[in-house]
Amino acid sequence: MRNSEEQPSGGTTVLQRLLQEQLRYGNPSENRSLLAIHQQATGNGPPFPSGSGNPGPQSDVLSPQDHHQQLVAHAARQEPQGQEIQSENLIMEKQLSPRMQNNEELPTYEEAKVQSQYFRGQQHASVGAAFYVTGVTNQKMRTEGRPSVQRLNPGKMHQDEGLRDLKQGHVRSLSERLMQMSLATSGVKAHPPVTSAPLSPPQPNDLYKNPTSSSEFYKAQGPLPNQHSLKGMEHRGPPPEYPFKGMPPQSVVCKPQEPGHFYSEHRLNQPGRTEGQLMRYQHPPEYGAARPAQDISLPLSARNSQPHSPTSSLTSGGSLPLLQSPPSTRLSPARHPLVPNQGDHSAHLPRPQQHFLPNQAHQGDHYRLSQPGLSQQQQQQQQQHHHHHHHQQQQQQQPQQQPGEAYSAMPRAQPSSASYQPVPADPFAIVSRAQQMVEILSDENRNLRQELEGCYEKVARLQKVETEIQRVSEAYENLVKSSSKREALEKAMRNKLEGEIRRMHDFNRDLRERLETANKQLAEKEYEGSEDTRKTISQLFAKNKESQREKEKLEAELATARSTNEDQRRHIEIRDQALSNAQAKVVKLEEELKKKQVYVDKVEKMQQALVQLQAACEKREQLEHRLRTRLERELESLRIQQRQGNCQPTNVSEYNAAALMELLREKEERILALEADMTKWEQKYLEENVMRHFALDAAATVAAQRDTTVISHSPNTSYDTALEARIQKEEEEILMANKRCLDMEGRIKTLHAQIIEKDAMIKVLQQRSRKEPSKTEQLSCMRPAKSLMSISNAGSGLLSHSSTLTGSPIMEEKRDDKSWKGSLGILLGGDYRAEYVPSTPSPVPPSTPLLSAHSKTGSRDCSTQTERGTESNKTAAVAPISVPAPVAAAATAAAITATAATITTTMVAAAPVAVAAAAAPAAAAAPSPATAAATAAAVSPAAAGQIPAAASVASAAAVAPSAAAAAAVQVAPAAPAPVPAPALVPVPAPAAAQASAPAQTQAPTSAPAVAPTPAPTPTPAVAQAEVPASPATGPGPHRLSIPSLTCNPDKTDGPVFHSNTLERKTPIQILGQEPDAEMVEYLI
């Protein structure tokens, strides 16, 4: 029918889930046996002929079945929630499995097989029958983590065993555990005493027909398996958390007879489970029977006991009072064939017999309660059941016992029933007794049918009540399921979290250890690395210092090289400029040479004319001599006459001449004073002009800088424009600064030259003031020679050109020195510098003859004295020399009184009457005859004519009044001894025209050429000449060391010279600078 069709499907689903979870999460060694169990479970039927193994047709009452199907469906819906933490339960199970094995043992293979067969057979088992599944399991059969109502602990029994098991149990599957909990909780309320069909309608009725209560059931669960006496029984209530306290207290009725011991033994003794199934369909026993034939029930119970149906123990417990019926009722041969096929027969029983079975149990219970003396027999029967229980456990430990092997237990239990054999009687008594029994049984059957009708009504009412109770229990079961699921989830999560926390603690501890180790290693590495880096840094510092030193050294060398390069470039530029200047000067000198050649030709002609003039002069002198002698005679005669007649006019004339001379001297002194004042004011003017020029330059520089700053800070101009402007400004500033520097140097040298000139003028004036009386005495006997040009002009021209050559000796330098030297001070050595030689270009234009500006005569004529050796670089041309009148008053050819060297200076004057007045004392004051008398510059024209003809050697040589005013000067260093007279250049009167020849300018000794006079001022002391350089002198600059070149202030009018090394220097003429006539006049 419908129930029978749905039973295999529903039970197989639950079993398959359990097996799948076990195969998935369980021990791999048990998977093979579980697969075999699953194959047996999904087969045609169980291998054992169990009473509950092959269920027959069930009742058609649908209300309990539908209710149970709803329950199963609800459990199936709730099961997947428990699978969410199955992996966590497996982890916790593995962690806690050693702890659980100490208290409980896992089920063996046979026990597991029995349980699986039970779950397959009891597919839609009622909650009452399923409750005993968990309750029947002893310590061996209980799987780990399944809650059991009965805990068989040998020591103590905790009252909260279920709670402790819930907290401590290790769940293999949460859904399996929750299903068993729900079955267990419902099983306490619905306790069927005897049934083989799990969902038969009388099953809930039997619970209320049973006089025993759940409290008595729990009372009997405490004793150990080896306790068989009633005294060992203890009254135990249900565990604290199980909902069985509110049951009806029916145990008060059954407690004096202690029927709970009967249930306790059958709870503990599983082999006697199917006895009730054997005796279930027997006729009711006689009420007053002594029931001696219990031994028959024992072999039958042993024969029918199967280890696969836990429900058989419940049926045996409910049907045990029926086993106490008389043996005549049990030994009928018609009922014994039911034993082997009792399961099949019970499946085909009609419904009234199935309903009669609980009634039998009820009547048996009343009969058992009416006979209190049967407690001893019950005790013996319990002992026998206990023996069968041990025997059945031994059979369960054998692997895979066949169903037929269960009958081997029958002969062991038969000898124990010997004491219950019936007493033999005669056949009449037996027949009469049988008739009585038939009557009694018929009456009893009639009564029992009436009772059965009443019981049907009660059962109907009780089914309604049970339906309500089942609904309530179902609701309660749902609550328990949800709460248990929630608690299990919470516990699983708590366990999982605790395990995770422990794992994280361990992991954290390991990480701390690793961190400490890593820190130590890192510290060691850092220390080693720091040591290495310190060493490396120290080495790098040392190398850096060395490299810095090398860099500084290289930078210094580079700066030096740059400065040297710049100097070389500047020198190259200067030399290029000087070369161009020299080339220009060479061209100019060639032009001048042509002009001078013309002059030479003219001079030759003039010399020829001079010779003629000399001849004419000699004739004229002779005539004059004659005339003079005649006039003297006349004068003497006139004087004699005047003395005799009147002498006053002569005195007046002499007085007039002396007064005129005194007046002339005063005028000349005043002129000199005025000229000195004019020079002073000119110097002040120049200084102020220089300062004004400096101020203007500084203002221009500041303005240029300000303009450059404004341009550089202007936001409209770009960086490139500002940079170009700045570079251009800097270049202009550099050029301007160089130009200003050159101008300053020139001005400084000009001022220095002016100072020297003024010093010379002062000395000349001092000497003139001393020598004025002697000059007046000598000039009183002289008269000017107006037929010839003044010797003062010639002398001044000669000396002025000498000073000009001193200021710019580049012509002589070009002629004599091939290794040209620049004129800047940085290119000159210390020994090449003279005291009075300027080392920078002088603003005074060189190579320009200084024009004489004589205040008295106003003559600007220049007598030219030149030599022919210019083209052969042997001699130097003596340019025209101009000497101002006040300077020319001093004697230029001073007698040199030096003890180390005596310089003979010979100056041949063309004009015989233009001999200086101081030349005679100079010649007379010479210490030895070797001292040459020099014909130097003459004094003012007024005093020039008073010099006598025989005043000096030079005057004798220059007797011709019309001779040219040329002088050949030769300077030669001599020994400390006085130079003999032949060392002098004898210039006879007829040979005065050849005085300028090169042959007459040679010294008798091969001495180096003399340098020009270093003083830039027109000093009237030395006239210069150039001697041809000997081979020993070389092409270098020719110098003349003059240790002491002094003029005797007592004898001559020349200045005192203190010069160590006289050098020819080549001051560079600034390009584009023209000669300044006014400056030349001022210097003159």
From Swiss-Prot:
GO molecular function, one term: angiostatin binding
A GO CC annotation given for this chain: glutamatergic synapse
Location of region: Disordered: 24-86, 185-205, 224-268, 300-424, 837-876, 995-1041
Stretch list, region Involved in interaction with YAP1: 410-751
Compositionally skewed regions (Polar residues) per UniProt: 854-867
Record GO biological process: actin cytoskeleton organization; angiogenesis; blood vessel endothelial cell migration; cell migration involved in gastrulation; cell-cell junction assembly; chemotaxis; establishment of cell polarity involved in ameboidal cell migration; gastrulation with mouth forming second
Low complexity composition bias: residue spans: 309-332, 393-403, 995-1010, 1020-1029
Intracellular or extracellular location(s): Cell junction, Tight junction
PTM per Swiss-Prot/TrEMBL: Polyubiquitinated by NEDD4, NEDD4L and ITCH, leading to proteasomal degradation.
Coiled coil ranges: 429-689, 721-751
Phosphoserine sites (modified residues): 714
Residues in cross-link Glycyl lysine isopeptide (Lys-Gly) (interchain with G-Cter in SUMO2): 594-595
Tissue: Expressed in placenta and skeletal muscle. Found in the endothelial cells of capillaries as well as larger vessels of the placenta.
Keywords associated with the record: Cell junction, Coiled coil, Isopeptide bond, Phosphoprotein, Tight junction, Ubl conjugation
Pfam families: Angiomotin_C
Sequence motif PDZ-binding, residues: 1081-1084
Additional note from the record: 'Motus' means 'motility' in Latin.
Family label: Belongs to the angiomotin family.
Job description of the protein: Plays a central role in tight junction maintenance via the complex formed with ARHGAP17, which acts by regulating the uptake of polarity proteins at tight junctions. Appears to regulate endothelial cell migration and tube formation. May also play a role in the assembly of endothelial cell-cell junctions. Repressor of YAP1 and WWTR1/TAZ transcription of target genes, potentially via regulation of Hippo signaling-mediated phosphorylation of YAP1 which results in its recruitment to tight junctions.
Swiss-Prot/TrEMBL domain comment: The coiled coil domain interacts directly with the BAR domain of ARHGAP17.
Subunit structure and binding partners: Component of a complex whose core is composed of ARHGAP17, AMOT, PALS1, PATJ and PARD3/PAR3. Interacts with MAGI1.
The protein's name in its UniProt record: Angiomotin
